Design a protein with these regions (language model features):
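Positively charged n-region of N-terminal signal peptides that target proteins for export
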Residues: 1-4
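Sequence context surrounding c-type heme c attachment/ligation sites in exported
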Residues: 20-80, 84-152
Length: 152
């Protein structure tokens, strides 16, 4: 009985450590990093749902104001992988308006204490620049223990 209590307590105490982790799947195709991370962070696919990823990947010719078109074979490979690994957690599974994570309910809730001018700091530049503040964002760790908001 005591062991069960201690085990339950340990699991409960560890929950906040894993609460903000959306790991990058180990089977990420090299094309995802090569194509997507050449302009921005290669976001863990679990941060958005299937419909968002499908919409993003079918609209690469107008990808947030840029033509990000890629070879059809690579597009299919990346799309299939993103959909396979898309959000399953309730927190991330709602549609992100305009396919922007930064407009999703979970993102707004997580960042509601930040003023609008924070995103304009030279060290951040954009709300989509996760790695500016979340030092382990590339591995899917968005926890506050690794958070460091640039002062400028």
């Amino acid at each position: 009985m005591k062991n069960n209590f201690l085990l339950s307590l340990a699991v409960f105490l560890a929950m906040p450590v894993y609460a903000d982790k959306t790991p990058m799947p180990s089977d990420a195709p090299k094309s995802y990093e090569a194509e997507c991370a050449s302009c921005h962070m290669a976001f863990p696919p679990g941060l958005m749902n299937q419909k968002n990823w499908q919409s993003i990947m079918t609209g690469l010719s107008k990808h947030f104001g840029t033509d990000a078109s890629i070879d059809a074979k690579l597009q299919t490979e990346i799309t299939n992988w993103l959909i396979k690994n898309s959000a399953i957690k309730q927190k991330y599974s709602a549609m992100a308006p305009d396919n922007r994570m930064t407009k999703s309910a979970w993102f707004i809730k997580e960042h509601d204490e930040l003023k609008a001018d924070v995103w304009k700091r030279a060290g951040i530049k954009s709300a989509a620049n996760c790695m500016a503040c979340h030092k382990d964002a590339a591995s899917g760790d968005f926890s506050e223990r690794n958070l460091q908001v640039p002062a400028k």
